[in-house]
Amino acid sequence: MAALSLLDLARALVDIDSTTGREAEACAYLAAYLRGRGFHVTEQPVSGGRTNVVALVDPKPTVVLSTHIDCVPPFFPSSVEHGLLYGRGACDAKGALAAQVTAAERLRESGEAKVGLLFVVGEE
């Protein structure tokens, strides 16, 4: 799977309704994207059929980047105006999530493979 730009990944995530309790589609998308980019992904079961997403390159990371997948209602999709991304979760925390994925990929490409990602549900 080809890498998405930071903006495209953030926008793809913002366009998925992941208000608290409805994170399944966003988690599935994120897990598939990360697998397609060569990460070893574990979907960690949580209550109510929900999952956290753990993605590793090395089984013993020295750094783990983490944030949450869920956001508060109501859902509304993304828009980009004057170079700025708007939409539910763009700032809290899907933009940060996309930035963490992008950072992990760049670290891996530079030879620093000991980075992990942990994205959790139910923070809101």
Give the residues covered by each predicted segment.
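Acidic/His- and Gly-rich active-site-bordering loop/insert found
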Residues: 1-90, 108-112
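Acidic/histidine-rich catalytic neighborhood of metal-dependent amide-processing enzymes
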Residues: 94, 98-124
